[in-house]
Amino acid sequence: MKKSFFSVPRTLPLHALTTFLIGVGCVWPLSLSLGLTAPLSLCLTACGAVTLLFALLDCMPRLRALAYPLLLLAIGGSALSLRGQFSAVGAALTLMVHGQPLALAAYSQELSLLLSLVFTGIGASLSRSEQAFFPLALLEIALLFIVSFLGAQIGAASLLPLILALLLGGE
């Protein structure tokens, strides 16, 4: 029997929602704790674009293998947008840890985009796994540890997407 070019998997809505929630749930608290001043809409747009990419390629079985190479290409392009400024970003991160909260503001949009792409890609991997509850719980604990280590006061609302993704991923 010939495979169709486009078929919608039964679990697509759950996987897409979980992917999006993991991306937003990781990037939003990290952005707040790092003092990144990029608008939340940039994060939502990047997470939505990666989620849409994975959802569309899940519907096309013959092209499904292109999802991660395309994501890696986008991450590489985002990292190249910093063009040799990695040492400056590292120095700004060191200054931020030592009490200069506005040190990373100059790199806010690039870092928000990079974090959104990376964490939504991780979310896409975790949302498609049957045993994703414990890795997702470990990711949430690590995120809480990083946020508390940075000493930032973030609202509880920024943690809700990741908690909801944890509950959805446990099904």
PLM features: residue spans?
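Linear, non-domain "peripheral" regions
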Residues: 1-171
